């Protein structure tokens, strides 16, 4: 827990209400055959990268302030309730008819050969006007982002976001101009929108992505004033601090893997928490030793969580 000093984080992105389903085969499973199955709902809670990161940091003891514009459906209300349950401050979370709520169904099943697989199905909540995420507006006399900024009465230690949405990028740029450390995470890079991603990365202090999300790293040469982190799955993690070249760290091995979903989110949240414990919440504080130590600690949490079903198994097991 982060008990020495009450640090704060503000974060935003694409939120989901995750429904984790496990398929069971009551008559057994025969590879290559059409096997009868039943689906059992195991977990239903807020998820996605920003949802998990903000909830995990709330659990770690941070003042965690997610920004979210949900609808007022049952699902949207549950997402707000879940944020509170995991220790978040929902001051900047709203549930209105104009909001939006996304649902993600994650099904744990067996493929035709009997190998465990995950299947994903995303949709929006019944009654939501649009499946898209809602954000502040940035233009026009009624733009809501300037009003949000004008109403802020504090600066968080860290601002986290993971989309290319203009409002969240502009908020990050403004936060950084005020001395807040900005952490940007790339979930999936679509090359036709690469200029948007690059703009977000250039206006951040820390940039993180996985080897699955980003393959071509030629752009890293343009980020020589950043900390760039790339997770490598079972191969560990590597980082490039201020353009000094890549440093690769070994993985933390887990021989009892149940579910790897959420490991990247634990890496992010645990890394931020580890920086906080070391008093390194300003980019100028970052050294190779601090980054290495914090990333190894982050990998330990991510590896532990892989022994549980769901993205926040460690928390559930400790409550």
Feature map (PLM): residue ranges:
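Short, small-residue alpha-helix embedded
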Residues: 54-56, 62, 258-286, 290
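Short alpha-helix plus adjacent loop in nuclease-associated cores
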Residues: 101-108
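Glycine-rich phosphate/adenosyl-contacting loop at the front of the ribokinase-like
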Residues: 1-67, 74-78, 85-88
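Ribokinase/PfkB-type carbohydrate-kinase core domain
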Residues: 2-20, 82-95, 108-250, 279-284, ...
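Short alpha-helical functional segments enriched in proximate histidine and acidic residues
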Residues: 86, 274, 301, 305
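Short pre-catalytic strand/loop immediately N-terminal to key active-site residues, enriched for Gly-Thr
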Residues: 36-45, 250-262
């Amino acid at each position: 827990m982060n008990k020495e000093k009450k640090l704060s984080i503000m974060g935003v992105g694409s939120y989901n209400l995750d429904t984790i389903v496990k398929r069971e085969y009551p008559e057994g499973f025969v590879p290559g055959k059409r096997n009868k199955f039943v689906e059992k709902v195991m977990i239903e809670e807020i998820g996605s990268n920003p949802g998990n990161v903000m909830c995990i940091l709330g659990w770690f003891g941070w003042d965690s302030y997610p920004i979210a514009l949900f609808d007022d459906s049952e699902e949207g209300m549950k997402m707000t309730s879940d944020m509170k349950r995991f220790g978040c401050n929902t001051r900047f979370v709203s549930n209105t008819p104009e909001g939006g709520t996304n649902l993600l169904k994650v099904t744990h099943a067996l493929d035709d050969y009997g190998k465990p697989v995950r299947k994903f199905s995303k949709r929006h909540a019944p009654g939501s006007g649009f499946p898209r995420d809602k954000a502040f507006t940035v233009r026009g006399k009624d733009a809501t982002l300037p009003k949000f900024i004008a109403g802020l009465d504090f600066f968080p230690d860290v601002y986290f976001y993971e989309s290319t949405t203009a409002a969240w990028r502009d908020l990050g740029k403004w936060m950084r101009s005020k001395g807040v450390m900005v952490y940007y995470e790339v979930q999936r890079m679509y090359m036709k929108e690469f200029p948007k991603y690059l703009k977000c990365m250039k206006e951040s202090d820390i940039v993180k992505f996985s080897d699955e999300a980003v393959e071509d790293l030629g752009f890293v040469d343009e980020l020589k004033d950043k900390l760039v982190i790339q997770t490598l799955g079972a191969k560990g993690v590597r980082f490039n601090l201020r353009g000094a070249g890549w440093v690769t760290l070994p993985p933390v091995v887990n021989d009892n893997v149940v579910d790897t979903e959420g490991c990247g989110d634990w890496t992010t949240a645990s890394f931020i928490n580890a920086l906080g414990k070391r008093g390194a919440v300003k980019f100028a504080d970052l050294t190779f030793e601090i980054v290495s130590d914090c990333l190894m600690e982050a990998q330990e949490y991510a590896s532990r969580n892989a022994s549980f079903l769901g993205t926040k198994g460690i928390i559930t097991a400790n409550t």
